[in-house]
From Swiss-Prot:
Belongs to the glycosyl hydrolase 27 family. This is Alpha-galactosidase. InterPro entries: Aldolase_TIM, Glyco_hydro_27, Glyco_hydro_27/36_CS, Glyco_hydro_b, Glyco_hydro_melibiase, Glycoside_hydrolase_SF, Melibiase_C. The keyword Signal applies. Its EC number is 3.2.1.22. Transmembrane segments: none annotated. Glycans are attached at N43, N105, N175, N270, N370, N403, N417, N422, N454.
C-alpha cells in the first residue's frame, strides 16, 4: 500500500473563499429532484412527468427536498414561423405551460432542457444564437430550471473564454426575462468550468456522463480519475472515476454555484447496496446536486431507503455549503475484477461547528479503517480547540429505514406520520437545531483528543459519521 495523493485545499479562514453570493439568488443549497434521462432517455411525455411527480409526492420524497421535475432532451418538434421552440404535440398535447401549472399546483418546480449548440444531443433544435427567444419561451411556459447541454457547439470551445462566452449568452437571456430560473450547465467540465461557472450559473457538470458502474474503466470515458482538466470528457464514466475527478474541485463550489457530479444512479442498473450507499453518501459530501435518475414507480425498497435517508441529505443541504475535502487516498492490493482498489478519507465542516467524515473502501474486501482528530481537522494547528475537544460520533446510516418499512410505503403509495423527515414543514437547518434524531443518525461513541475512530468498512462501501462537540 502506498500514498498516492494528499489534497489540502481548505482555506485556514474557512469563510474566505465562500464570500461570493449566488449570481441570481438561487441555488443556496444544491438542487434536488428527478430527471428522466438516465432511465427513459427520449421516451418522454406529459404523462411520464405528471405521474412521476405524483409518485415522488406520495412516497414522501418531495417533502425530503426533491422538488425539481426536470424534462430532458427530445421534447421539441421544431420551431414555429417566428423562430420559437414548439413542444411535440404527441408527447405534450396540452403544452408545456399546462405541465408547469400542474407541477406548481403540487408544489414542484419545473425544469426543461436545451443545448448551447445548433442541435441538442439527440438532434433536436438547440439554442446557440437563439438564446433570447428560447429563454423567453422557457419563461413564458413558467419554467423554473434550465439544464443546458454542450452538443453541436460548432467548435466554440477550447479556452475558458470561449466556453464562458457561449454559456453566458443564455445566462444573460434568462436574467433578462425577469423570471428566476435555476441555470444548470452541462458542458461536461470542458474548459475548466469550475473556475468560471459561478459567475453565470448555479451548477455545472464537471465530468463526462455517469453510468451505473462503481469502478469499471471504459474507453468511452477516456480520462482517468486524476485528470480533472479532461480534454475529452466522454460518457459511461464510473462513480469512482467522477468522484476522483471532483476531489480537487471542492474549493470552487459553494453557495449559489455547485459542482455537479451528474444524476444519481441509485436504483439504476445493478449496483450493490453498499455501492449505492457510497454513491449517495459521497454526492452528498461534496455538495453535488441530488437528482434522482431512477424510475420512481419501480424502485426497489433498498434504493428507496437510500434516497430517503434524511441524515445524509442533511449533509448535502447543510447551510454552510462547504464541500468535503479528500484528506488522503491510498491504493490497496485487494482490487476488484477491473483491477481497481483504493481507500479514501474525506472530511468537511458543517453548520454549528459539526463535522462530517467518510471512510471509503474502494477495494474488493472488507477492511478495518480508522481516523484520528488530526485526520479529521487536517488544517488545525497543534493545541487548537478542535484537537483538544471530545466529539460525539453519529453513524448517519444506522437509522436507515428497513426494507419492510420501505416496501410498505412503496406498495401503499403513502408515508405514515413521522416515518420520514418532512423538510417542507421544517427545514434541515431548523431540524438540526431542534435535535431531530432522524437528521443525526445514531450515536455510536465519542472520540477523545487522543482517540481513534475504528470501524470495518465493506467492499465498495462507506462509513459516514457526523461529529458534534461533546461539550
Amino acid at each position: 500500500m502506498f500514498n498516492l495523493n494528499f489534497f489540502n485545499y481548505t482555506c485556514h479562514c474557512e469563510w474566505c473563499f465562500w464570500v461570493l453570493p449566488s449570481y441570481n439568488g438561487l441555488g443556496l443549497t444544491p438542487q434536488m429532484g428527478w430527471d428522466n434521462w438516465n432511465t427513459f432517455a427520449c421516451n418522454v411525455s406529459e404523462d411520464l412527468l405528471l405521474n412521476t411527480a405524483d409518485r415522488i409526492s406520495d412516497i414522501g420524497l418531495k417533502d425530503l427536498g426533491y422538488k425539481y421535475v426536470i424534462l430532458d432532451d427530445c421534447w421539441s418538434s421544431g420551431r414555429d414561423e417566428d423562430g420559437f421552440l414548439v413542444a411535440d404535440e404527441q408527447k405534450f398535447p396540452n403544452g408545456m405551460g399546462h405541465v408547469a401549472d400542474r407541477l406548481h399546483n403540487n408544489s414542484f418546480l419545473f425544469g426543461m432542457y436545451s443545448s448551447a449548440g445548433e442541435y441538442t444531443c439527440a438532434g433536436y433544435p438547440g439554442s446557440l444564437g437563439r438564446e433570447e427567444e428560447d429563454a423567453q419561451f422557457f419563461a413564458n411556459n413558467r419554467v423554473d430550471y434550465l439544464k443546458y447541454d454542450n452538443c453541436y457547439n460548432k467548435g466554440r470551445f477550447g479556452t475558458p473564454e470561449s466556453s464562458h462566452k457561449r454559456y453566458k449568452a443564455m445566462s444573460d437571456a434568462l436574467n433578462k426575462t425577469g423570471r428566476p430560473i435555476f441555470y444548470s450547465l452541462c458542458n461536461w467540465g470542458q474548459d475548466l468550468t469550475f473556475y468560471w461557472g459561478s459567475d453565470i450559473a448555479n451548477s455545472w457538470r464537471m465530468s463526462g456522463d455517469i453510468t451505473a458502474e462503481f469502478s469499471r474503466p471504459d474507453s468511452r470515458c477516456p480520462c482517468d480519475g486524476d485528470e480533472y482538466d479532461c480534454k475529452y470528457a466522454g460518457y459511461h464514466c464510473s462513480i469512482m472515476n467522477i468522484l476522483n475527478k471532483a476531489a480537487p474541485m471542492g474549493q470552487n463550489g459553494g453557495i449559489g454555484g455547485w459542482n455537479d457530479l451528474d444524476n444519481l444512479e441509485v436504483g439504476v442498473g445493478n449496483l450493490t447496496d453498499d455501492e449505492e450507499k457510497t454513491h449517495f453518501s459521497m454526492w452528498a459530501m461534496v455538495k453535488s446536486p441530488l437528482i434522482i435518475g431512477a424510475d420512481v414507480n419501480h424502485l426497489k425498497a433498498s434504493s428507496y431507503s437510500i434516497y430517503s435517508q434524511s441524515s445524509v441529505i442533511a449533509i448535502n443541504q447543510d447551510p454552510k455549503g462547504i464541500p468535503a475535502t479528500r484528506v488522503w487516498r491510498y491504493y490497496v492490493p485487494q482490487t476488484d475484477k477491473y483491477g481497481q482498489g483504493e481507500i479514501q478519507f474525506w472530511s468537511g465542516p458543517l453548520e454549528n461547528g459539526d463535522q462530517v467524515i467518510a471512510l471509503l473502501n474502494g477495494g474488493m474486501k472488507a477492511r478495518p479503517m480508522n481516523a484520528t482528530l488530526e485526520d479529521i481537522f487536517f488544517d488545525s494547528y497543534q493545541g487548537s480547540e478542535e484537537l483538544s475537544t471530545s466529539w460525539d460520533i453519529y453513524d448517519l446510516w444506522a437509522n436507515r429505514i428497513d426494507n419492510a418499512t420501505a416496501s410498505a410505503i412503496l406498495e401503499n403509495n403513502k408515508v405514515t406520520n413521522n416515518t420520514l423527515y418532512n423538510a417542507t414543514k421544517l427545514s434541515y437547518k431548523e431540524g438540526l437545531l431542534n435535535g431531530d434524531s432522524r437528521l443525526f443518525g445514531t450515536k455510536v461513541g465519542t472520540i477523545s483528543p487522543d482517540g481513534i475512530i475504528n470501524t470495518t468498512v465493506p467492499a465498495h462501501g462507506i462509513a459516514l459519521y457526523r461529529l458534534r462537540s461533546s461539550s
